[in-house]
Amino acid sequence: MIPAARRPFRDDLRARLIRNADLVPCRTAFIDSRTPGSDRKENFTLIGRGVSESPEQHVHITLPHGFNIGGARQPPHCVNSQHYHETAEAFFAHSGTWAVTTGERGDEGRAELPTGSLISVPAHVFRGFENIGEDVGFLYFMLGGDDPGRVTWAPDVLEKARDHGLILMETGRLIDTLAGQSMARDERPQAPTPRDELDRIVVHLDDTAMRQVVVSLEEARAFDSAVSAPGVVEAAMIGPANPAERAPAGKLDWRHGFVARSLSLEPRAASPRHRRAEPEVIFLHEGALFIEVEGESIELAPGDTFSVPTGAVRRFRAEGRRAVALVTRGSDHPAKAELDG
């Protein structure tokens, strides 16, 4: 039996709700934030500290979930420079059309990410991304672990940044010399990763491999979950097969430390009331979604994020419009949902 959550008060639930309209951006989150071509991007840390290098980065929810959630908002032709992570990184195109490139110079592999698709780039693969659409776009990020570590940048990214007043320290602290900041006596600038170390660590993905790490909402694999109901469909995108949930493997079937599922509800459809043993985060992609938690109700609009209290009874419903959400759950093999009554 899943332990029941302390009955949440409305203020508790509001603290777990991140409205798209209330997102607090950081425009100097990373070493390349002033490099021409990358100087108009905004970084968001929704849940967890993420990998931002700026001490000014606002964190919306600090409660550990076992994974981190973030976001990036970029205008057309704005680039996030080549880098790699120590844990799994997946990102979902909520709006805009994106190109994701691999390789230290971005010339090894390429995949396009239209709105409503998701890509997961394995650890130690140099990756960068660019908004190639005509409007401002938003990427929603999922990073494995409570502490996803630090970003490793392609060597030329560090060199270019020096010309624009930003220096990354070995400690991970970002110094803005244009703002009058300076190094402490015991600090040293981060040197580019040695070539022999890159040769040993870096993983390479070409165009063919890149096609295998992208999944669209249409490719998500529907299954008869414990919370299925007429007009309510859950479908696997990230994660291995999970007999406890009767879930098939998603197209992206390797371990991430979390699973990602699409959840769609037709107008006036509703899920059964149920509990979950793991952290569960709901990101609304389209429509309007009502989430009832222990008798309280919250309405999500597109771009809103909500962290459901672990163990709390929850129910999802749509009213006049179809709702499509991206769901992130902790663990590679979440427990079966427990129906309430």
Indicate where each model-derived feature is located.
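Ligand-binding pocket scaffold of soluble enzyme catalytic domains
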Residues: N68-G70, A99-T102, E108-A111, A249, ...
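Conserved short histidine dyad/triad with adjacent acidic residue
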Residues: R49-Q57, N68-H85, P243-P248, V259-R276, ...
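A short, N-terminal "cap"/entry segment at the start of jelly-roll beta-barrel domains
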Residues: M1-H65, M169-G257
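Short acidic-glycine-tyrosine-enriched beta hairpin
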Residues: A88, E104-P122, G295-G311
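Double-stranded beta-helix
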Residues: I2-D11, F126-A209, V313-G341
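Short beta-strand His + acidic residue motifs that chelate non-heme Fe in jelly-roll/DSBH
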Residues: N80-Q82, V100-T102, G109, V121, ...
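Glycine- and acidic-residue-biased ligand/ion/polar-headgroup-sensing regions
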Residues: P75-C78, E86-A99, G103-E104, A277-E294
